[in-house]
From Swiss-Prot:
Biological source species: Pyrobaculum islandicum (strain DSM 4184 / JCM 9189 / GEO3)
Listed cofactors: Zn(2+)
Lineage, uppermost ranks: Archaea, Thermoproteota, Thermoprotei, Thermoproteales, Thermoproteaceae
Summary of the function given for this chain in its UniProt record: Involved in allosteric regulation of aspartate carbamoyltransferase.
Protein name: Aspartate carbamoyltransferase regulatory chain
Keywords: Metal-binding, Pyrimidine biosynthesis, Zinc
Length: 151
């Protein structure tokens, strides 16, 4: 394996590393990143990793994620590591943790849940009931959701 950089370093922003292979697009989706924001975004998928075998990496230039955004990433990428970059250096590094509450990011998979009724302005809300592996429960219908249900 070569030690050359696949994607250049960023001056400032956020690097999301150790994303399970194939989940980077789901991370971008839950963060609401479309590519039209006007900031440079680098996406590398299926690169070799000692810890995961294969992994994805996302670099977002000139944007630091909020704590809420960081923790929501754990719903689709529980092994992710967040690196905050300033002046080409990592100034903070931490792992994501599942949030206690998720509001409005995912749809309940129960077709009869009130959050799926077209005339009901109810925001889907999920509560964390287990951290490892993450398990959430819908606040309205009580249906349990694992990661594969929410992605």
């Amino acid at each position: 394996m070569s030690r050359e950089l696949i994607v250049s370093k960023i001056r400032s922003g956020t690097v999301i590393d150790h994303i399970p292979a194939g989940r980077a697009l789901a991370v971008l989706r839950i963060l609401g990143i479309t590519g039209k924001e006007g900031v440079r975004i680098a996406l590398v998928m299926n690169v070799e990793s000692k810890k995961l075998g294969k992994k994805d990496i996302i670099k977002i230039e000139d944007r630091e994620l909020t704590p809420e955004e960081v923790n929501i990433i754990s719903a689709v990428a529980p092994t992710a590591t967040i690196n905050i970059i300033e002046d080409f250096r990592v100034v903070r590094k931490f792992k994501v943790t599942p949030p206690e509450v998720i509001r409005g990011k995912f749809k309940c998979r129960n077709p009869t849940c009130i959050t799926n009724a077209p005339r009901e302005p109810v925001e889907p809300t999920f509560y964390l009931v287990r951290r490892e592996p993450p398990l959430f429960i819908c606040a309205y219908c009580g249906r349990y959701h694992e990661l594969s249900d929410l992605i």
